[in-house]
Amino acid sequence: MKTLLILTILAMAITIGTANMQVDPSSQVQWPQQQPVPQPHQPFSQQPQQTFPQPQQTFPHQPQQQFPQPQQPQQQFLQPQQPFPQQPQQPYPQQPQQPFPQTQQPQQLFPQSQQPQQQFSQPQQQFPQPQQPQQSFPQQQPPFIQPSLQQQVNPCKNFLLQQCKPVSLVSSLWSMIWPQSDCQVMRQQCCQQLAQIPQQLQCAAIHTIIHSIIMQQEQQEQQQGMHILLPLYQQQQVGQGTLVQGQGIIQ
């Protein structure tokens, strides 16, 4: 209301001043003496200056922060550029170059099929192996004894080969059952011959007896074994012949 009153007073003063200027030009000198005219300028400058700058604080803060944020998605579009050059360049040169030269390896497998022909000839070497134990027996040499002593020891050798056991029976009973048996005669001869041999040579003589008995038993066993091995060896030779025929068929 104050502002309206001030405006009306100013309008009335202006109209009165203009009317006086038109009527009396000499009255222009009296206008500077009137001081109440510049007073209405003070409320106009005080009241609106305080209210109008307040809304200016809200507008620059809010919109300025929100608009630069949408610039972030521009970084995400640059990422897909990395996987496209990396993936296709690596697998294409590596894979096709390696498998093609590997197909040349099956050419080596064909000459390997000739190896089974050598395996059939191997069993031929194994058959004469049973003859090897014959070499070990003659290596055992008896101690050297004079031929005269060997003849003296022969009754003891014969006594042992007959497997007589006069010690297990009482001498009286033995004489009653077999008064003059072969074992008793050979035992007496052996004792007589050993008594004639010097004591230094008795051990060597007994050793020769035992060694000769062992050699005779081994020879008998070998002869019996040869009778058994000969038919087996013949069967093996027949089997080798069939294998050779089979090789000819395979070839």
UniProtKB/Swiss-Prot annotation:
UniProt keyword Metal-binding, yes or no: no
UniProt signal peptide:
1-19
Q: Which residues cross the membrane?
A: none
Q: List the Pfam families hit by this protein, alphabetically.
A: Gliadin
Does Signal count among this protein's keywords?
yes
Q: Give a GO molecular function annotation for the protein.
A: nutrient reservoir activity
Region annotation (Disordered) maps to 26-143
UniProt lists the family membership as follows: Belongs to the gliadin/glutenin family.
Query: Can you name this protein?
Result: Gamma-gliadin
Q: Which organism is it from?
A: Triticum aestivum (Wheat)
Lineage of source species: Eukaryota, Viridiplantae, Streptophyta, Embryophyta, Tracheophyta
